[in-house]
Amino acid sequence: MTSGSNYMRAAAALRHLSREMDGGSTSSSSSARSAAESLLSGMGRRWRHVQGVGAAADRLASELHVGAAGDVVRAAAWLHDIGYAPPLVDTGFHPVDGARFLRAHGVPELVVSLVAYHTGAVFEAEQRGLADELAAFAEPPSELLDVVTFADLTTGPNGAEVSVAQRLSEILVRYPEDSPVHRDGVVTVIARRRGSSRGTPGGRPRPVASR
């Protein structure tokens, strides 16, 4: 299947996602998965990672009692790396490129913002000189962002569950030393924030109901 047809399939799935979420559907994560699969299924480890994050977010949304926001978290988890898809690359910063694509296709803004800000994107955007581009999106509620980020940071590149420390180590090894993720301890700052007072002592996000 050509990249053009994959793009169209993803766009159609996102329009369906938007209608489902506007109508209060509780099964819209399947449309988010379809959109991600259309654009990422040919990317090997990237797609396996996304599948793992989707599964992790599903578990966390249930365990942490996020209520009606659970479908938003699940959708954002499936879509968090969609900006890596070659047809979407513009700035080269996948949270922004992905969020722009989602917004252009009518995805609810809360899902868009979770994709834009996931896993310390605010720190990396500053290092890349893309803070203004990221600021085009509103910051999402921290308790929802933490769920998506924790799911991402506890899923390895092949989709297997890993510790946050293992995942951060893998990221640092994978990116060259001149990458923005190495500057000023960006990855370390991300880890510290995920394990800060906003989460449990082990870095796991707090149940939303207890906040």
Predicted features and spans:
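Divalent metal-dependent phosphate-bond-processing catalytic cores, especially two-metal-ion Mg2+/Mn2+ enzymes
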Residues: 2-26, 38-67, 79, 105-107, ...
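N-terminal glycine-rich anion-binding loops that anchor highly charged ligand groups
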Residues: 28-30, 49, 71-74
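His-Asp-centered metal-binding catalytic motifs of divalent-metal-dependent phosphohydrolases/nucleases
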Residues: 69-102, 112-122, 152
